[in-house]
């Protein structure tokens, strides 16, 4: 009788053990919904002037999550969509939004003056910062981030700019962590930022 019980116990335990092993081997849920690019070293030479006239580097925002988007003020759709999305993200974050810095880097420094950025960027959220620099400095930083941009039109002031439309996200420790595709659901972005703020 005892041996029969042992046999039954082993019979039951075997599939349970197998299920446990399968669960252990199953891939874990990704920490982020956005693309995890931890380890990329973009932005080491980031140094521009914000729309208040203050020189800035990424070190100025240590302890905060920093998002960086490259665009221009006369962009007809992509840029306002990106900034509006981040405005929604900030609302979703509530008090935690104070630990986030949204940065808009112009790829049109010839037209986007400091004054124009000061009028444009805070419309979406007064905490957002527009960044400008000399054309060669913008080109250097864009190249560092693997951001493409090119003028299209008559180039005499009547032109648009084709440009990369994703957003880069740095963690509070200053490391580049995520790439967010254009028009991503703000709730997804907010969840990823909350995870970074929580130490992931």
Regions found by a protein language model. Give the residues of each.
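A short beta-strand-turn-helix
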Residues: 46-66, 90
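N-terminal export leaders
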Residues: 4-13, 17
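Short loop/turn microsegments at loop-to-beta-strand junctions
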Residues: 43-44, 66, 164-166
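Thiol/disulfide oxidoreductase modules built on the thioredoxin-like
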Residues: 137-192
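Structural microenvironment flanking redox-active thiols in thiol-disulfide oxidoreductases
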Residues: 81-141
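C-terminal motif of bacterial Sec signal peptides marking the signal peptidase cleavage site
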Residues: 21-24
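Short active-site neighborhood of thiol/selenol oxidoreductases, capturing the structured segment around
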Residues: 58-82, 86
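Bacterial signal peptide processing site
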Residues: 26-29
């Amino acid at each position: 009788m005892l041996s029969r019980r042992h046999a039954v116990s082993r019979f039951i335990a075997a599939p349970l053990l197998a299920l446990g092993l399968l669960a252990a081997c199953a891939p874990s849920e990704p920490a982020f919904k956005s693309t995890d690019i931890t380890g990329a070293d973009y932005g080491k030479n980031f140094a521009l002037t914000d729309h208040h006239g203050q020189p800035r580097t990424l070190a100025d925002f240590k302890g905060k999550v920093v998002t960086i988007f490259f665009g221009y003020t006369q962009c007809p759709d992509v840029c306002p969509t990106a900034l509006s999305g981040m405005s929604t993200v900030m609302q979703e974050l509530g008090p935690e939004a104070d630990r986030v810095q949204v940065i808009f880097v112009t790829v049109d420094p010839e037209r986007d003056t400091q004054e124009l950025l000061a009028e444009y960027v805070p419309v979406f959220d007064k905490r957002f910062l527009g960044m400008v620099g000399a054309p060669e400095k913008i080109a250097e930083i864009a190249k560092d981030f693997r951001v493409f941009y090119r003028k299209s039109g008559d180039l005499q002031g009547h032109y648009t700019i084709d440009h990369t439309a994703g957003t880069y996200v740095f963690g509070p420790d200053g490391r580049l962590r995520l790439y967010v595709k254009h028009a991503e659901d703000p709730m997804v972005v907010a969840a990823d930022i909350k995870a970074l703020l929580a130490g992931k």
